[in-house]
């Protein structure tokens, strides 16, 4: 059973398994199982760590003519080592059990927690990007027109002034956000991030993730899809180390309001 995992029907597998699937998902699955997802963005740079090597450096699975076939070396270990086989199946079963709390009809589940690197995979990005490089948002030609936005609501007192943004909720539907430090509206990154917003023809899909503070670790709560409010983008500046630094502010509105219990856990105000 380990040689051929299953044959893709391409049409109908979503109905059989009740899961969200399209061509981008299938390509992403291939890249993860072949470990290409973990290659460095600049493969010619010898200083870039090849994360593929962390996972053995070999494809776990090969996808040929619509059939996923397990790597022969991996299959041999499973056939000849009962302890390894048991541990392998425990991991698979644990993953399936853990997946039951997620909405299988959508890439992301509102109210669940995700690390920035997990979101890379779930949004079908071509490569894994480190959380440090993603920062508060990330867009590139390899992110399939998606733009996840990450907000740490209460900033620690000892963090750098350059990342001490004053993001805040206006209400359970709307949030005021900031770009990364040093950005200008007329520059390439901001033009790409807000392309089509004022014309009502947004180019990107935006996803909002929030955590209360860094005490919660590296994961953020997914609050849902959102859109940048028309004409909300403003060029501003902040005084950092005695110098005025440019920054862009903008407002986003969620398609669905934040659950009130969760909302007040962020803003720190008790309901009457």
What are these regions (language model features)?
Residues 1-87:
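C-terminal helical accessory/scaffold domains
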Residues 1-10, 14-15, 107-219:
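Acidic, glycine-rich low-complexity segments with interspersed aromatic residues
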Residues 7, 11, 15, 25, ...:
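Short linear sequence elements within intrinsically disordered, low-complexity coil regions
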Residues 19, 97-102, 120, 147, ...:
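Generic recognition of cysteine residues
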Residues 19-21, 147-152, 250-254:
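Generic recognition of long tandem-repeat/solenoid scaffolds
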Residues 73-131:
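Extended alpha-helical interface modules used as scaffolds for assembling large macromolecular complexes
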Residues 213-272:
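Compact mixed alphabeta submodule
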């Amino acid at each position: 059973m380990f040689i051929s995992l299953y044959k893709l029907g391409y049409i109908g597998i979503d109905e059989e398994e009740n899961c969200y699937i399209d061509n981008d998902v299938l390509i992403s699955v291939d890249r993860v199982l072949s470990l290409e997802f973990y290659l460095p963005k600049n493969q010619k740079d010898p200083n870039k760590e090849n994360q593929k090597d962390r996972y053995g450096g070999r494809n776990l699975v090969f996808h040929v003519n619509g059939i996923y076939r397990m790597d022969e070396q991996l299959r041999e270990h499973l056939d000849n080592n009962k302890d390894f086989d048991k541990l392998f199946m425990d991991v698979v079963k644990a993953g399936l059990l853990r997946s039951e709390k997620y909405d299988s009809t959508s890439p992301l589940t509102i109210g669940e927690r995700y690390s920035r690197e997990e979101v890379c995979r779930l949004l079908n990005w071509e490569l894994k990007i480190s959380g440090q490089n993603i920062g508060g948002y990330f867009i590139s030609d390899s992110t399939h027109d998606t733009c996840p936005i990450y907000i740490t609501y209460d900033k620690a007192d000892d963090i750098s002034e350059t990342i001490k943004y004053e993001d805040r909720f206006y209400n359970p539907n709307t949030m005021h956000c900031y770009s990364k430090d040093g950005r200008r509206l007329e520059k390439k990154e901001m033009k790409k991030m807000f392309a089509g917003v004022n014309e009502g023809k947004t180019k990107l899909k935006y996803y909002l993730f929030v955590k209360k503070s860094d005490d919660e670790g590296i994961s953020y709560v997914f609050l849902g899809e959102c859109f940048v409010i028309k004409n909300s983008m403003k060029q501003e500046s902040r005084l950092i180390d005695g110098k005025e630094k440019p920054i862009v502010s903008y407002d986003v509105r969620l398609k669905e309001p934040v659950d009130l219990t969760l909302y007040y856990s962020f803003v720190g105000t008790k309901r009457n």
